[in-house]
Amino acid sequence: MKKSILTGMIAATLGLFNTANAEGMDPAALKTVYDITRNTAGLMSYCVDKGFLKAESIDNAKKMVAYVAAIPGGVDTRDGDKREAMGREGNVLNDDGKVVALEKEAPQGLQAWCQQADEGIRQGLTSIGQ
């Protein structure tokens, strides 16, 4: 389960920009993508605070959030602030919907997770020309 949580978040980040452009994307799936991007933005702040990343990583995560929020058709953003705050505390939701500490759950270690997630965000932004 530990690996699936973190691998899923990274995969969602990497694949976000391809799936988000899909016409007629299911509203529930779009909300999930948005919630993940908001949680990831909070996690980038957490990683910067730990000294693993630079402030630019937070800016990139915010660009990703803005991109997803602007997808035509309306994105349910109601839980966004809560998801981002959870990330700033170093927490994610696992597959069962429980809040877990990323630091304890990252099989590759927190610093490596931060760097991999940051790279995934950069690649995603590059793929959409930002």
Predicted features by range, described:
Residues M1-T7:
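Bacterial N-terminal signal peptides that target proteins for export
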Residues T7-L16:
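Bacterial N-terminal signal peptides
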Residues A11, A29, E103:
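Generic anion/oxyanion-binding catalytic loop in active/binding sites
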Residues A11, V33, Q111-A112:
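Generic alpha-helical structural signal
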Residues L16, Y34, A41, P107-Q108:
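Processing junctions and N-termini across compartments
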Residues L16-A22:
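Sec/Tat signal peptide C-region and signal peptidase I cleavage site
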Residues A22-I58:
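Immediate post-signal-peptide N-terminus of mature secreted/exported proteins
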Residues E56-Q130:
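Compact alpha-helical subdomains of small soluble proteins
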